[in-house]
């Protein structure tokens, strides 16, 4: 009986959380005028959410590409198919690994920072002070961060992809001796803009919406204590990672299956 009660409580809690975050998203969309009328607010957040994440995304992409190049060359060589290494790495990064890994890195760095920042503003009653001054905190604080994250995520995924392909090139061509022309020509002949590049960007944009929405929602509704901010930041990273993987499965089934 206790098990059934526990499952029921968790199910109701999940439905309530889903409803809360949906209403919060609608509120952000309704209050987004300030983010576009005063673009300085969003541009500043693009710097904090996007530009400051470029280094970790680029370095991670480089090493992921190097690993893919090494593992791919080793396995493909067994079947005399090492020539398709460039295509294999590019397809893996553009369709799957680039958007997913870049989004998880974004969630763990910029997402957690957004939650902590908004949570600190709530703890120090800055959000309440905005309400007293007739300034809507969703329009002033949340919406610019939301749109900055949505805009930054596809760019970060693209940087991850470029760094990963270059990493595979370093390993496959410079180290293992694969012909440079074959590496690039296989990629050029088999990668398509719509099927590979555009679908990957759509994925990364969807991840950007999900991660940023979770981050600002957790910060805005956290318990206004230091422990509450810590728990909210942890929930942001964990929930974002699970949501990214769930959305990735749905989008992959829609985009890449007949």
Which residues does each predicted region cover?
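Short cytoplasmic-facing helical segments at TM-TM junctions of multi-pass membrane proteins
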Residues: 118-143, 226-229
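Membrane-interfacial helix-loop-helix connectors in multipass membrane proteins
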Residues: 71-94, 162-205, 209, 213-233, ...
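Hydrophobic alpha-helical transmembrane segments of integral membrane proteins
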Residues: 139-148, 237-257
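Start (N-cap) of specific transmembrane helices in multi-pass transporter permeases
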Residues: 45, 136-157, 232, 236
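Hydrophobic alpha-helical transmembrane segments that constitute the membrane-spanning cores
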Residues: 60-63, 102-110, 143-172, 214, ...
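Loop-to-helix entry region at the N-terminal start of transmembrane alpha-helices
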Residues: 56, 60, 82-114, 148-157, ...
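Short, membrane-interfacial amphipathic segments enriched in basic
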Residues: 1-41, 218-223
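Membrane-interface helix starts
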Residues: 34-59, 238-241
């Amino acid at each position: 009986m206790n098990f059934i009660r526990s499952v029921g409580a968790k199910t109701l809690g999940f439905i309530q959380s889903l409803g809360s975050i949906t209403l919060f998203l609608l509120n952000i969309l309704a209050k987004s005028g300030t983010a576009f009328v005063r673009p300085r607010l969003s541009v500043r957040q693009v710097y904090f959410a996007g530009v400051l994440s470029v280094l970790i995304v680029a370095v991670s992409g480089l090493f992921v590409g190097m690993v893919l190049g090494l593992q791919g060359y080793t396995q493909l060589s067994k079947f005399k198919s090492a020539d398709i290494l460039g295509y294999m790495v590019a397809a893996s990064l553009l369709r799957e690994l680039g958007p997913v890994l870049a989004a998880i890195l974004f969630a763990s760095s910029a997402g957690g920072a957004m939650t902590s920042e908004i949570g600190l503003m709530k703890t120090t009653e800055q959000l309440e002070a905005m309400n007293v001054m007739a300034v809507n905190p969703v329009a002033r604080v949340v919406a610019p961060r939301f749109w900055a994250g949505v805009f930054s995520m596809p760019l970060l995924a693209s940087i991850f992809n470029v760094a990963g392909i270059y990493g595979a090139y370093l390993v496959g061509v410079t180290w293992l001796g694969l012909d440079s022309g074959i590496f690039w020509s296989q990629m050029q002949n088999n990668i398509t803009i719509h099927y590979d590049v555009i679908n990957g960007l759509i994925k990364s944009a969807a991840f950007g919406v999900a991660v940023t929405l979770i981050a600002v929602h957790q910060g805005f509704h956290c318990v206004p204590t230091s422990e509450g901010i810590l728990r909210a930041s942890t929930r942001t990273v964990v929930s974002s990672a699970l949501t990214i993987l769930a959305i990735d499965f749905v989008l992959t089934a829609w985009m890449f299956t007949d």
